Every structure is written in structure tokens, then in C-alpha cells.
Amino acid sequence: MKRLLITGGSGYLGRKLVQMARRDWTVVYTYLNNQIDIPRAMSASLDILDRDKVLRLFHNFCPHAVIHTAYSQDNLEVIIQGTKHVAEASEAVGARLIHLSTDAVFDGARGWYREDDTPLPIHPYGKAKAEAERLVNCSVPLATTTRLNKNAESQVATALVNRSAAIVRTSLMWGLEPMDSRTLHLVNCLNEGGRLALFTDEYRCPIYIDELASAILELLNLDFCGIIHVAGPERMSRYEFGLDLARKLGLNINGITPGLSRLSELVRPKDCSLDTSLARGLLKTRISAPSELLA
């Protein structure tokens, strides 16, 4: 069987990818602090900020393909430099690279963003992910206002151009077996009699984790290179999505209250809905709307 390396294999998406890919691939998955055991797959501890260790692992395993899901909300260098190291190592061993990105590379001013729309992130995480996209493929447009700093600009200028890579921008990942962290928080809060405020003016395109993983694995075997949006077909506010989840799980929806992002002090994009026409035409994997799965 062909060999597949998945970074961030102990994360929510990474674990699902390992579980699904091991049927058709010899899989190695990496972790940093959260070591987990997944039968019929091999694990490796890896700090992707350590370039030499990244290159060593790639040369030892020599993967045919790589899915890069590892990231950190707390250390943005993991996103920027870590992605650069993974892209360099993938190129060095001739591996196909699938890089996971986010709808947060957009400012959320209008929604239904296409792959060729210029990223304009408004918070540090989105800016780091936009820079990471450029490190994977310099054909990705990026407004100059999103530059992190002069050092980051020099990193971009010397970045690897991985022409065989695909960049998958996605949205809110959710699932019930196991639950994603947001759903688990909602369940725990409502079961304890608490109240949870969810924004009515912040829109995303939630995608079921199993279907996202299936789409990514399908993409591995295609010749597609460049950016592709893989997200749910339904634009939903966080409030609407939370209510649907609570009803499906038999929870007390009265504990969910509407809130307004614009009245908070948070700097967050309001409407990051993604146009997924390209993915619908390219992939056989069907992506369901939450309203279908939670009915």
C-alpha cells in the first residue's frame, strides 16, 4: 500500500483521517503532546518547528502523500514556520501535499467567498493561516495589509513553491461520535443548567467531520492542485446551529440565548460562508447540510 503521513493526528480532524485512511494506506500520524493509540496505524512524536526532525521523519518514512492538519492557536509560528517545514519536506521526498486552511483568512464583510477571492484576515490566527497558504503556494493572493511583520515578509519571499499541493479551506467542523469541542461544551453547559449565548450575526458553513475527511482523502487521489473550498452547503449563524444541535441531542434549548458579535469586544469575521461550487463539481463525496443530518 502507498504511504500517507498525517500531521496533527491526535487532533479532531487528524484522528478521523487516520481512522478512515488506514483501510487504503499505510499511515503514520504525528502528535506533539497528546499521544493516542490508533490501531493499524503508526504514530511519531514530532515538533514541526524543528526543521531537521521534520526532514528526518519524512526521509525515513518516505510518504507518497501528506495531509497537514497540525496547528496551534497559541503559537502562530507553528502555523507559519511549521507549515513551511512540512511543505519543504513534502517537496524533498516528492509527496503530494494537502494543506488544511480556514475560512478565517477572509474578513467576513460579504460572505460566499470563492477560491480566487483575495484573503483579508482581521485577526492573528487568520493572518497566520493566510501566510501559511502562501508558503505552500505563492500563487495565493494576499492583500498587503495582512502582513504580520517584516520578518514574516522575508519568510514569504524565500518560501517554497509547492506546485503539487492542494489547499483545502474549510469551516466549522462538527461531529457527534465523538463530539467536537464546541458541541461538547454546549452539551455540558446545558446539562448543568447553564446558559450559553451564541451569536446571531456570525455566519459559517458547518461541515460534518466524516464527510470532510472523506473529501480530503478523495482529493489525495486526484490531480487537482491549488485552492479548494470544502465546507457545508448551508450558511448558518452560530445561534441557529446551536439550536439545531441542542434539539437533536434532546437538550433544553431555553438555555441558549441569542447574542450579537457586533456588541462584543471580539475581533471576528462576521460572514465567512464559502462558495463550494468547485468542490461540488470535482468531488464525488457529498457534503450534507447540518439541517439534513440533525433532522
Regions found by a protein language model. Name each.
Residues S45-H85, E91:
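NAD(P)H-binding glycine-rich loop region in Rossmannoid oxidoreductase-like domains
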Residues L4-R23:
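N-terminal Rossmann NAD(P)H-binding glycine-rich loop of SDR-like oxidoreductase domains
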Residues L184-R195, R204-V230:
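Alpha-helical substrate-binding/gating segment
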Residues N252, V267-A295:
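C-terminal amphipathic/interface module of NAD(P)-dependent oxidoreductases
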Residues Y29-D37, I48:
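N-terminal Rossmann-fold cofactor-binding loop
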Residues Q81, R96, V105-V168:
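Catalytic helix-loop patch of NAD(P)-dependent Rossmann-fold dehydrogenases
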Residues R134-P141, N151, V156-R204:
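NAD(P)-dependent short-chain dehydrogenase/reductase
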Residues A215, L222-S264, R268-D271:
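Mid/C-terminal beta-alpha module of Rossmann-like enzyme folds, strongest
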